[in-house]
């Protein structure tokens, strides 16, 4: 075992400090406070799925720990799970799909990151996500939507990725695969559906006779024997009493969207951390079969991000303060390898309104920025990687009128109403000429004029779009005045949220964490955003949560002795 301590000192005021692994001579004679077969670090969707799937074998004793109350970033998410191949919801809505068709579609996102057979296995396994989740109290189903939307207002099954784009259609037949969780007590969702997805799973965990769920408990260091094999873990747990109650209140309120919007979350985070530091007590847990690291990514650790992905520091972290890289660091202290730590998924959606995709996007150099109809993660990547955090949509008066009209009639959640008002009134510039518009937004006038001229000429001449935009979305930008709507990262009321996509390297079949030489680290598994996953190359809505289910199941099947992904057909 060769420990890697590169990031141990990269902490913020809300981070969990991870210490180097503790070596002990003999685990059998050591003093332990608790003992289990399997220990799961982090109980978001990945950890919850790993715990519940492992618990199906009643002979396995499980302890699951979470820094907060459980749910993690998954509970704060849109609650979309990307699954297909013929799910119950798809069949009920008349959506035709197959595992092979889904895998072909996903190849646009996964690229060469995973073997084709792994992507097919993921697609085939996803057909079983729905009944399993429903068995634990989650509600899923239709109706389906045919619209091009970033997040559905009423539909619960929609095109959540690049399925309907020209590039997507070239690979597979489009099918709605974004499944939105519904309220467990009935009715349709009225808010972000992560709040409907996680609570039933957490309640199910509490009902399992062979799972002990230690809330308000954070992992501090791994414990290994003289050979370097994992034999336990040391955690810091807040004892019962007033401190635990106060911590739960501060931690929970700190994740509230309204409180965050009012910029009061930071104060609550500090209260929670102060309680952790003052009152948490060390607990040593003996682990016999294995550890699953499912503690999220590191989007809230801006010190770590400054080293790995500095271009994305202007993004807004999506998750909780527990997304601090602690799970990744724990793995590294026992020799785990990492990859793609510079890979960030940052989202800037150009739909809805759908007609924004008919505009021409440009960067600060005045050149075309991105294919406007692609999923928001591709746009966000272009804004940061090509535009240095800046970008605009260029529209003419007729197109601007259409966009404003679409915004007026579309159904919007409260946060969307606030965003659109700011975008139209505060984040859009106008001028009578393209050159005048360029001067207002600070891009080279000659380059912007040439970009728009070329864009229009290709449409007039029948030439293919330079970025493969669908023909139905192409229209000339020629009737002034002209408009530039900012899609940059500096918009307070329309920020670009981001998740980290890199993490521990895992075996595609077993979920075992690998060292830098590609050898398994004994008794160590990882899931969700602590690990490289199906969504790590390119993310689309629901793919991270789907990977949480998949990777959690995979680790569980390995711990049950079923060979990881090989056991997912059982």
Explain the meaning of each model-derived region.
Residues 38-64:
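N-terminal Rossmann-like FAD-binding beta1-loop-alpha1 element of flavoenzymes
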Residues 56-78:
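Glycine-rich FAD pyrophosphate-binding loop
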Residues 82-122, 134, 141:
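Glycine-rich active-site loop/strand segments that organize a redox cofactor
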Residues 192, 241-349, 545-554:
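Glycine-rich loop(s) and the adjacent beta-strand/alpha-helix scaffold that form part
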Residues 328, 337-443, 447:
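An anion/pyrophosphate-binding glycine-rich loop and adjacent beta-alpha core
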Residues 447-534, 538:
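A glycine-rich dinucleotide-binding beta-alpha-beta segment and adjacent secondary-structure elements
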């Amino acid at each position: 075992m060769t420990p890697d301590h590169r990031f141990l000192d990269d902490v913020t005021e809300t981070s969990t400090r991870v210490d180097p692994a503790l070596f002990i001579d003999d685990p059998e004679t050591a003093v332990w406070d608790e003992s289990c077969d399997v220990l799961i670090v982090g109980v978001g969707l990945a950890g919850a799925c790993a715990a519940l799937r492992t618990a199906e074998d009643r002979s396995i004793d499980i302890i699951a720990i979470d820094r907060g109350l459980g749910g993690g970033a998954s509970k704060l998410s849109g609650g979309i799970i990307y699954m297909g191949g013929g799910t119950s919801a798809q069949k009920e809505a008349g959506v035709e799909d197959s595992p092979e068709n889904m895998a072909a579609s996903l190849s646009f996102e996964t690229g060469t990151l995973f073997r084709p057979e792994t992507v097919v296995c993921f697609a085939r396994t996803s057909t079983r996500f729905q009944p399993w989740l429903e068995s634990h109290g989650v509600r899923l189903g239709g109706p389906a939507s045919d619209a091009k939307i970033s997040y559905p207002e009423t539909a619960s099954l929609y095109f959540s990725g690049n399925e309907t784009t020209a590039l997507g259609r070239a690979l597979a037949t489009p099918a709605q695969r974004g499944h939105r969780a519904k309220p467990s007590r009935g009715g349709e969702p009225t808010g972000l559906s992560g709040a409907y997805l996680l609570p039933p799973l957490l309640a199910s965990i509490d009902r399992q006779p062979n799972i002990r769920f230690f809330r308000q408990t954070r992992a501090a260091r791994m414990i290994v024997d003289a050979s370097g094999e994992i034999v336990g873990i040391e955690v810091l747990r807040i004892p019962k009493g007033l401190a635990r109650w106060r911590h739960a209140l501060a931690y929970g309120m700190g994740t509230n969207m309204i409180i965050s919007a009012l910029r009061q979350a930071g104060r609550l985070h500090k209260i929670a951390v102060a309680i952790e530091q003052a009152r948490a007590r060390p607990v040593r847990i003996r682990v016999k079969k294995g550890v699953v690291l499912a503690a999220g990514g590191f989007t809230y650790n801006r010190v770590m991000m400054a080293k790995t992905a500095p271009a994305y520091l202007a993004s807004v972290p999506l998750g909780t303060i527990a997304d601090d890289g602690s799970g990744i660091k724990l793995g590294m202290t026992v020799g785990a390898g990492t990859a793609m730590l510079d890979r960030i998924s940052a989202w800037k959606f150009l739909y809805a309104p759908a007609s924004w995709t008919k505009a021409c996007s440009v960067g600060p150099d005045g050149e075309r920025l991105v294919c406007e109809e692609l999923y928001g993660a591709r746009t966000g990547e272009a804004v940061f990687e090509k535009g240095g955090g800046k970008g605009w949509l260029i529209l003419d008066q007729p197109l601007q009128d259409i966009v404003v009209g679409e915004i007026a009639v579309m159904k919007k959640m409260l946060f969307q109403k606030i965003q659109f008002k700011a975008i139209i009134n505060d984040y859009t510039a106008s001028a009578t000429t393209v050159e005048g518009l360029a001067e207002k937004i600070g891009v080279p006038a000659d380059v912007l004029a040439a970009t728009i001229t070329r864009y229009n000429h290709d449409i007039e001449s029948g030439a293919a779009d330079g970025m493969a935009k669908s023909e139905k979305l192409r229209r000339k930008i020629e009737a002034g005045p002209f408009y530039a709507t900012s899609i940059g990262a500096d918009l307070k009321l329309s920020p670009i949220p981001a998740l980290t996509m890199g993490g521990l390297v895992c075996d595609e079949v077993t979920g075992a964490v690998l060292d830098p030489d590609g050898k398994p680290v004994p008794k160590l598994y990882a899931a969700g955003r602590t690990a490289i996953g199906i969504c790590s190359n390119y993310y689309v809505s629901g793919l991270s949560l789907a990977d949480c289910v998949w990777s959690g199941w995979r680790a569980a099947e390995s711990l049950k002795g079923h060979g990881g992904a090989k056991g997912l057909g059982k």
